[in-house]
Swiss-Prot record:
GO terms for cellular component: plasma membrane; proton-transporting ATP synthase complex. Its main location: membrane. GO terms for molecular function: ATP binding; proton-transporting ATP synthase activity, rotational mechanism. Keywords: ATP synthesis, Cell inner membrane, Cell membrane, CF(1), Hydrogen ion transport, Ion transport, Membrane, Transport. InterPro entries: ATP_synth_F1_dsu/esu (IPR001469), ATP_synth_F1_dsu/esu_N (IPR020546), ATPsynth_dsu/esu_N (IPR036771). It comes from Nitrobacter winogradskyi (strain ATCC 25391 / DSM 10237 / CIP 104748 / NCIMB 11846 / Nb-255). It is found in: Cell inner membrane. This is ATP synthase epsilon chain. F-type ATPases have 2 components, CF(1) - the catalytic core - and CF(0) - the membrane proton channel. CF(1) has five subunits: alpha(3), beta(3), gamma(1), delta(1), epsilon(1). CF(0) has three main subunits: a, b and c. The keyword Glycosyltransferase does not apply. The keyword Cell membrane applies. Produces ATP from ADP in the presence of a proton gradient across the membrane.
């Protein structure tokens, strides 16, 4: 399988840089996969699980929003936050979700809608983490 260069950058660090076979991205308009030779595109990403496939192995990385750009040079993802599932403190993540739920009562209108949408994304990540832990 043909490979391409992939960089995953967050404000804190260069989370990943290397040649990969495929990257599956949680896009705002729907999840999408990138392979070598993909058409150029810029897409917003939502909080979710990004999957990197390289050399027959998969690495799952949690991203909390950002931007993905596919060009002739490869794929660059600029993530607001990027953490591998191995590095994630699951108890702290659960506490974050509980805090988000508690703060819903302070919001209304479009602010409430956005908070619920973000909470749903976080709960989806938590569900994926629980499923991943069972395999």
């Amino acid at each position: 399988m043909a490979t391409f260069h992939f960089d995953l950058v967050s404000p804190e660090k260069l989370a990943f840089s290397g040649e990969v076979d495929q990257v599956d991205i949680p896009g705002v308009e729907g999840d999408f996969g990138v392979l070598a030779g993909h058409a150029p595109v810029v897409a917003a990403i939502r909080p979710g699980m990004l999957t990197v496939t390289a050399g027959g192995t998969q690495q799952k990385i949690i991203v909390l929003g950002g931007l993905a750009e596919v060009s002739e040079k490869g794929l660059t993802v600029l993530a607001d936050v990027a953490t591998s599932i191995e590095e994630l403190d699951r108890a702290q993540f659960a506490d974050t979700i509980a805090g988000m739920e508690a703060r819903l009562t302070d919001k209304e209108g479009s602010e409430l809608d956005k908070a619920i949408e973000r909470l749903d994304h976080f709960k989806s990540i938590q569900s994926q983490l629980n499923t991943t832990a069972m395999h």
